[in-house]
Amino acid sequence: MSNFLLVIPEDVIKGCSKADKLVVTGEFDNWRHSDYVLQYDGSTQNYRVQIPRRKGQRSTMFKVVINDKKWVTLNYFDTVTDKSGYTNNILHFKDNEASQLMDIPLSPHTRSNTAKGKPEDDSLNDYVNLSSHSDLSSTEEIVCWNSDMEDENMDATIQCDFHQAFNSRKESLNGLMCIAKKVKTYWNK
């Protein structure tokens, strides 16, 4: 069994003060909500706690308990409904494994000859545009088809300011590094 550092940004847990007791509970502690108290880190404005992870475990369900009374799920994480019908957050360990990430040196690579036998000197300014081809790509603009939709219907919508919340965090680069690793593997075939 190993430990996993769970980090939750301060602005994700709304309506709580630093005096409130915030406990993470889930499958890993049999929903006892006593051992895994979130600690606030003022320098990064995050709450942190180490949670256990069994070897080979790819995900775990969890919730946050506020002051031993209020059980909440957070829009920041994916949700799943368990066998009893309860909605819980789910944490995918595989997406966050540091062992899958590697340092990829980014340096210009010039080719010796093109198909016509001419050297390519302008490859130094080349770039690769990485985008998703899924139904809701992060690079696509989502247009609301019903402009009469009221704000109260949007309560369950996840809203994040990616420019503020994630720019200084190491975790924000992990996804980019995974994509870069896949691109590098593709090019080396």
UniProtKB/Swiss-Prot annotation:
Region ranges (May facilitate interactions with the autophagosome membrane): 176-187
Alphabetical list of InterPro entries matching this protein: AMPK1_CBM, Ig-like_fold, Ig_E-set
Consequence of gene disruption: Disrupts glycophagy (autophagy of glycogen).
Binds glycogen: region residues: 1-96
CDD domains: E_set_AMPKbeta_like_N
Residue numbers of Phosphoserine PTMs: 107, 172
Sequence motif ATG8 interaction motif (AIM), residues: 127-130
Molecular function GO labels: autophagosome-membrane adaptor activity; glycogen binding
Keyword Zinc-finger set for record: no
Cellular location(s): Cytoplasm, Cytosol; Cytoplasmic vesicle, Autophagosome
Region annotation (Required for sequestration into autophagosomes) ranges: 97-189
Keywords linked to the UniProt accession: Carbohydrate metabolism, Cytoplasm, Cytoplasmic vesicle, Glycogen metabolism, Phosphoprotein
Induction: Induced during prolonged nitrogen starvation.
One annotated Gene Ontology cellular component of this protein: autophagosome
Family annotation (SUPFAM superfamilies): E set domains (SSF81296)
Any one GO biological process: ascospore formation
Self-association and partners: Interacts with ATG8.
Protein function: Autophagy receptor for glycogen that facilitates the sequestration of glycogen assemblies into autophagosomes as part of bulk autophagy; the autophagy of glycogen (glycophagy) is stimulated during prolonged nitrogen starvation and during sporulation.
Misc. remarks from the entry: Present with 1540 molecules/cell in log phase SD medium.
Name of the molecule in the record: Autophagy receptor ATG45
